Amino acid sequence: MSDTERNKASGDVLYIITCAAGSAPLVQEFVKVAQQAEWDVCVILTPNATQFVDVAQLAQLTGHPVRSEYKRPEDPDALPRADAIVVFPATFNTLNKWALGISDTLALGLLCEFTGLKKPILAVPVVRKNGGLDAHPAFMRSVRLLRRYGVHVFYEPEIYPPRNEVPGEVILDTLHKILVRQSQ
């Protein structure tokens, strides 16, 4: 199946939600990979992630404003509605809040909303193996909860050491497999 056929079957708007992590600058390359697969990409940042990436450059690359804050109710939506979401990089903090249903940022609000709508979501945590946070009881509990909610969590630090920094092509291929499964 070509990339064009893949997206016609699955929708064409992809939200990439990016958290404040050292690997956040990698989102720029992931945007390019997704665009090559003909996704219309929109980037949503956690408030702290705005300090880790070049917001203006991401807006220019995607052709959409990069959002990190809620809009006022009377303001029109600046972004098209997403058909799928990839959370990369997903941090310990965001995963735990999301699993508890806390929506105190735009990124978390969208994740909670789309989880409830059963939309395809792929989360790629960047939690260092044996770094302490991976052993915190809340982390794996949150991963299990999100999976039970229908979220696909790609956490394979043994394959992508040390922090599960998965290449964009692998993330997109995993998303494609999720979309194919959901369409059957």
Predicted features, each with a name:
Residues 1-184:
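A cross-family phosphate/adenosyl-ligand binding-site feature
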